[in-house]
Amino acid sequence: MKTFVLHIFIFALVAFASASRDSAKKIGSQYDNYATCLAEHSLTEDDIFSIGEVSSGQHKTNHEDTELHKNGCVMQCLLEKDGLMSGADYDEEKIREDYIKETGAQPGDQRIEALNACMQETKDMEDKCDKSLLLVACVLAAEAVLADSNEGA
């Protein structure tokens, strides 16, 4: 019994450490063009919001509009370089395909429904940088809510 409890504890610790590590990562840092997009916008990694900050919405209250816009421009750069966006226009089908490939989501998955809702919510925005950050923030917030609801289930 003690061994079983120890295994449960270790599993929980690893899961918590993994989630903490992911939330500390910078948004977009997993993409190949991350350094290029930072350089194109004269930013450093210190200027970019963390995944945890964005998924919790803290980025909106802890930073000025210019910081929000600059982070959005890096996100737009990444989306454009990956062929998912051109200017302020999404390629919704490519975004969906890329998201499914990255997350392993299956048809009917709530994460895909959340992605679709986020694209719908932001599709009419004209500023490409603000639009990109809002899309990323919307998806990260939805994923956090879904993860929390799945843990409680």
UniProtKB/Swiss-Prot annotation:
Cleaved signal peptide residues: 1-19
Cystine pairings recorded for this chain: 37-77, 73-129, 118-138
One function term, GO molecular function aspect: pheromone binding
InterPro entries from the UniProt entry: PBP/GOBP, PBP_GOBP_sf, Pheromone-bd_protein_Gp-9
Annotated Pfam families: PBP_GOBP
Location within or outside the cell: Secreted
GO CC annotations on file: extracellular space
Alphabetized UniProt keyword annotations: Behavior, Disulfide bond, Pheromone response, Pheromone-binding, Secreted, Signal, Transport
GO annotation, biological process: response to pheromone; social behavior
Predominant subcellular localization, coarse grouping: secreted
Superkingdom in the source lineage: Eukaryota
Transmembrane region(s): none
Database matches in CDD domains: PBP_GOBP
Its biological purpose: Colony queen number, a major feature of social organization, is associated with worker genotype for Gp-9. Colonies are headed by either a single reproductive queen (monogyne form) or multiple queens (polygyne form). Differences in worker Gp-9 genotypes between social forms may cause differences in workers' abilities to recognize queens and regulate their numbers.
Family as reported in the entry's similarity comment: Belongs to the PBP/GOBP family.
Subunit structure comment from the entry: Homodimer.
Protein name, UniProt field: Pheromone-binding protein Gp-9
Record organism: Solenopsis sp. (strain X) (Fire ant)
